[in-house]
């Protein structure tokens, strides 16, 4: 009976984790379609319904026409063009609401029925808190783009993505806790191996941060060659901003260079990890995920950011991180 209850909780956590990955994809599509600023208000309840008639559409369009983005980039756009942008952002927000409901309602049920332990309730409550923070961050990010300069800060974009990653990590690791069983094995797992995987996971998080910087700064639109950057291993314009440290965060060439370098470093470290733990199947999933993610990144760069591949690259970063969490959970179970 207890195993069946754990299975139902695990299925729920898996569904929530998948929905977060899908949300990341929808968010990426919204950004690349330049639709994120088309809805100028945040109404958590009434906003769940789209404009239902022509009068409502005219009202929404008139609100958008007061924004700097409309005046600067979309002046004179047709109603059909506006509807397309609006519906993309609407689906983004609707899916966020749906994800929240699919998490909250079963969470209340499982808690009241004592299907989950107090420790798990605390962990999932933390995830819920981050979900609320994520909603406010998303709106603040949109609001920041409705001012004189119609551009969303790449720092806000990164924070928005990182909060999604934190929620994904909390839910998926708890899912792995339910699914990964302790096995009788002759494999000796040392504490150093666990720490080594932890370092790789930290590097993946840093890599996701710089991936968000690349996206927010449009750094993928320069140096569309691989492995060289403008014919050089190290491009010449890495440190032209002053003070020098600012290049790490705001120089497009530097941000892309760091993103490339981290990808290769993670590949090398994961390859070493695989060689040292060759008898563990889950480590091969992690290595394969790294290879697929690098291929997606290189293709995205070479083809000048095609939307489908770029979104796949963004979504797969979470799957890569999840594969690392799964292997970490396995190691801790064996310990």
Curated annotation (Swiss-Prot):
It comes from the Bacteria. GO terms for molecular function: metal ion binding; oxidoreductase activity, acting on NAD(P)H, heme protein as acceptor. It catalyses: Fe(II)-heme o + 2 A + H2O = Fe(II)-heme a + 2 AH2. GO terms for cellular component: plasma membrane. Coiled coil: none annotated. It is an enzyme of class 1 (oxidoreductase). Pathway: Porphyrin-containing compound metabolism; heme A biosynthesis; heme A from heme O: step 1/1. It is a multi-pass membrane protein. Heme binds at residues 259, 313. One of its GO terms (biological process) is heme A biosynthetic process. Its EC number is 1.17.99.9. Belongs to the COX15/CtaA family. Type 2 subfamily. HAMAP family: HemeA_synth_type2. Catalyzes the conversion of heme O to heme A by two successive hydroxylations of the methyl group at C8. The first hydroxylation forms heme I, the second hydroxylation results in an unstable dihydroxymethyl group, which spontaneously dehydrates, resulting in the formyl group of heme A. Interacts with CtaB. This is Heme A synthase. It comes from Wolbachia sp. subsp. Brugia malayi (strain TRS). The lineage of its organism: Bacteria, Pseudomonadati, Pseudomonadota, Alphaproteobacteria, Rickettsiales. The gene is ctaA.
């Amino acid at each position: 009976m207890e195993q069946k209850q754990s299975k139902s909780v695990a299925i729920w956590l898996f569904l929530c984790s998948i929905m977060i990955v899908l949300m990341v994809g929808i968010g990426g599509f919204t950004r690349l379609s330049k639709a994120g600023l088309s809805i100028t208000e945040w109404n958590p309840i009434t906003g769940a319904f789209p404009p239902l008639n022509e009068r409502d559409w005219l009202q929404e369009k008139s609100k958008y026409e007061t924004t700097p983005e409309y005046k600067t980039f979309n002046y004179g756009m047709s109603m059909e063009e506006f509807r397309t942008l609006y519906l993309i952002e609407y689906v983004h927000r609707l899916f966020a609401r749906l994800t929240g409901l699919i998490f909250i309602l079963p969470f209340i049920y499982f808690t009241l029925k004592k299907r989950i332990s107090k420790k798990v309730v605390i962990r999932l409550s933390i995830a819920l808190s981050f979900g609320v923070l994520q909603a406010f961050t998303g709106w603040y990010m949109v609001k920041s783009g409705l001012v004189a300069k119609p551009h969303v800060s790449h720092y806000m974009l990164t924070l928005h993505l990182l909060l999604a990653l934190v929620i994904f990590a909390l839910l998926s690791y708890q899912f792995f806790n339910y699914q990964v069983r302790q096995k009788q094995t002759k494999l000796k797992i040392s504490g150093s191996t666990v720490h080594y995987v932890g370092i790789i996971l930290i590097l993946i998080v840093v890599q996701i941060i710089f991936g968000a910087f690349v996206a927010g700064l449009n750094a993928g639109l320069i140096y569309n060659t691989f492995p060289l950057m403008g014919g050089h291993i190290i491009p010449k314009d890495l440190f032209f901003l002053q003070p020098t440290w600012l290049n790490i965060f705001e120089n497009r060439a530097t941000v892309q260079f760091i993103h490339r370098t981290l990808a290769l470093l993670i590949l090398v470290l994961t390859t070493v990890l695989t060689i040292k733990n060759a008898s563990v199947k889950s480590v091969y999933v992690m290595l394969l995920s790294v290879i697929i993610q690098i291929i997606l990144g290189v293709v995205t760069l070479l083809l000048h950011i095609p939307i489908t591949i770029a979104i796949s690259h963004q979504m797969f970063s979470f799957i890569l991180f999840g594969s690392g969490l799964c292997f970490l959970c396995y190691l801790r179970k064996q310990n």
